[in-house]
């Protein structure tokens, strides 16, 4: 009888394992790059959404289009924000509204997307990427600051100011 070999040799199995390892390593690097880009793009989009939302409120009040806004205060309760707007008073309202609208920090570093002063310390600037920080230098000015990581994982920031007319 001639014996027929069934199965693979050790060398063949090692080659297959090596190929799978190389593909996995390449895939992980590509996946990390993709997720980092998605976090960065989502963070920039979130910053712009908060800015445009407040700009719309300011413009609507200034133009006499509306006298008040209904913002979410919880999953079931609404908060009425009246014109004229006050930047100091509106920060808390915006925090809750965006939280209950389902907006989240893409980096997961803070419990909410919009937070008053989430970059006040050096530690926060280094670790709270993705948070849209709202501050009010005065009653007529709302300042938005957001930190994110660029493609080289360096910290970058966006800063915008909305002025109440």
Predicted feature descriptions by range:
Residues 1-2, 56:
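Short, contiguous, well-ordered secondary-structure segments
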Residues 2, 35-36, 47, 108:
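General helical secondary-structure elements
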Residues 4-35:
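N-terminal single-pass transmembrane signal-anchor helix
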Residues 8, 31, 57-60, 142:
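Broad hydrophobic/π-residue packing in well-ordered secondary structure
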Residues 24-30, 53, 80, 133:
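Short, low-complexity cationic-aromatic patches
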Residues 36-65:
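Membrane-proximal N-terminal amphipathic helix
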Residues 59-165:
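Periplasmic/extracellular, small/polar-rich flexible segments of pilin-like filament-forming proteins
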């Amino acid at each position: 009888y001639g014996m027929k070999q069934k199965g693979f040799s050790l060398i063949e199995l090692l080659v297959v394992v090596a190929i799978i390892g190389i593909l996995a390593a390449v895939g992980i690097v590509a996946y990390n790059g993709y997720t980092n880009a998605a976090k960065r793009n989502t963070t920039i989009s979130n910053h712009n959404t908060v800015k445009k939302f407040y700009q719309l409120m300011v413009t609507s009040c200034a133009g006499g289009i509306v006298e008040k806004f209904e913002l979410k205060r919880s999953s079931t309760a609404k908060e009425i924000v009246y014109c004229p707007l006050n930047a100091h008073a509106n920060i808390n309202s915006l925090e809750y509204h965006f939280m209950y609208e389902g907006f989240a920090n893409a980096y997961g570093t803070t419990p909410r997307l919009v937070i008053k002063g989430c970059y006040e310390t050096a530690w926060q600037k280094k670790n709270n990427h993705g948070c849209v920080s709202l501050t009010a230098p005065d009653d007529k000015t709302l300042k938005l600051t957001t930190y994110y990581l660029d493609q080289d994982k360096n910290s970058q920031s966006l800063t915008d100011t909305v002025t109440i007319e």
